[in-house]
């Protein structure tokens, strides 16, 4: 008996009146994970499209894979380089034996030595990322299913995207219990309390990260959380620039200068999904081509960032090195590219109108640079900029609609 036939045979037990009626949401989630729902349109009007919500979410899920795989490779490579820089011989062996990520990597055929292969680096990075992703997926999925059972509606595939986005924007060293707590806040407080998918006004993944940032700042910011090496501390590129400008950008392990190309490719420490602008561009091209993400929002973010960063460059400052950061460095450092492509373009929390999307994107780009430059306590600004713009998105749409109504009334003399 095939899986599809099995699911069809037991479906009646989960339908209204069946003995497992209350578990319909769980059954439906499992069934639609593998197969397209068998629902058809029987009454007019018929609106047909080859891409439904499930396929949209799955395509976004696939679009972050380039950044995810590169991020795992980079996290493993950064950790191995740092470990071999600090330890050697028996001391390194003791460190490996005392950390389950390290010894699991070696048990699976990898190595932590300085000449580790790309496979070993990928494997070590996976031992950090995959447990976080699995924790986020299971805990967040539990809350999704629970609310669907209580409300008696289907499980939405949107959580596939929320879970992987959240896992990609946290440090690789984040404790698993904090990952569970963060996604709980994002799903329950930022989404389900307001009615679930389609009714939330904040991006759930960013809301969960913001909760962790303010509740547990030591585990999600600072200098010790970005490189997965025991005892290693190294400032991020944004923090280095804030301290001494472009000349202060150095690899914290080798001491070599960090070039723009290093940052663009992703050879720097950071969150798994945020380090490689190149990998993010590949994924962004997919979702823009399929019209899942709005090019207007992306262009607006770039315009806002370029204008404000150039303005700060012109003003200049003798005491704040961030004033000198040009727009092309803002693009490749921190979470700017990830936020612009995959967070700002969230179709639920972003503006709906075309003109509103432009203003929404411009606000994000401008606010991100302003937070980075003016706020000395917080070198990164994309997360707060997007959440701030989420609050204004309905206002932008309202103003656009009101202006359109007035223009049409004036046109027809009403």
From Swiss-Prot:
Pfam families noted in UniProt: NQR2_RnfD_RnfE
Catalytic reaction list: a ubiquinone + n Na(+)(in) + NADH + H(+) = a ubiquinol + n Na(+)(out) + NAD(+)
Top-level lineage group: Bacteria
Enzyme class: translocase
EC number: 7.2.1.1
Topology of the protein relative to the lipid bilayer: Multi-pass membrane protein
Keywords: Cell inner membrane, Cell membrane, Flavoprotein, FMN, Ion transport, Membrane, NAD, Phosphoprotein, Sodium, Sodium transport, Translocase, Transmembrane, Transmembrane helix, Transport, Ubiquinone
Localisation: Cell inner membrane
InterPro entries: NqrB, NqrB/RnfD
FMN phosphoryl threonine PTM sites in chain numbering: 236
This protein's record includes keyword Transmembrane helix: yes
Transmembrane segments: 23-40, 56-76, 129-149, 164-184, 268-288, 297-317, 322-342, 358-378, 381-401
GO BP: any one term: transmembrane transport
GO molecular function: FMN binding; oxidoreductase activity, acting on NAD(P)H, quinone or similar compound as acceptor
Tagged with keyword Lipoprotein: no
Annotated coiled-coil segments of the chain: none
GO cellular component: plasma membrane
NCBIfam families hit by this protein: nqrB, PRK05349.1
Complexes and interactors: Composed of six subunits; NqrA, NqrB, NqrC, NqrD, NqrE and NqrF.
Purpose of the protein: NQR complex catalyzes the reduction of ubiquinone-1 to ubiquinol by two successive reactions, coupled with the transport of Na(+) ions from the cytoplasm to the periplasm. NqrA to NqrE are probably involved in the second step, the conversion of ubisemiquinone to ubiquinol.
PANTHER family: ELECTRON TRANSPORT COMPLEX PROTEIN RNFD, NA(+)-TRANSLOCATING NADH-QUINONE REDUCTASE SUBUNIT B
Family the entry assigns: Belongs to the NqrB/RnfD family.
Protein name, UniProt field: Na(+)-translocating NADH-quinone reductase subunit B
Gene: nqrB
